[in-house]
């Protein structure tokens, strides 16, 4: 874990970013006409590609534009997001999936753990989007899941974090298609914590956090966990301001968020 200024940041899992549908994920989110034409010529389909992007503030978007070079940086270090202005904006993972599922010409991006039979993941450099390929390094498009808290964490919130990082919590993360950070974690030891805990942030992290909440409340009925879905930036702001106990981010944290 990392300790910086106001927040404690813990990485509790990782996942792969999967482009959806069988068109070129690399070209899909740029605004280069050369890339767009290459995608069309390399595909058996024809016609315009409907780009679906996550909203500003989304950790998924931030990770995607960085990993694929869609975000550029000038000599002064100023960053520019070159996602095409024609992109359809999906403000949650579920909306992204629905948009891509309902449009055979659409291409978007989501976490591997969110994938379903309704969409198809794009191979990257010939590698399929699987947990095994992320672990062996052949599928290189992956990013961390992080949680952040203020230093003065309640006993109930700390106990829930302990559960997430225990062997029990890490198994839930693995069972749901994500990459655990500690395959040698110790079993969860139930304590006497009680109270309410609010977890807020990334819609990509929310599904697995809901699974962790359900399992934790099954072994500790004295703690009530509320999971609020928004985006990574909102989650980090809420944790910093103390309006939630634990913030969720599906990307690396920015310097401005860690102190």
In which residue ranges do the predicted regions lie?
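Intrinsic low-complexity, intrinsically disordered segments enriched in polar/basic residues
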Residues: 2-4, 41
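Bacterial N-terminal signal peptides that target proteins for export
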Residues: 4-16
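C-terminal motif of bacterial Sec signal peptides marking the signal peptidase cleavage site
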Residues: 24-28
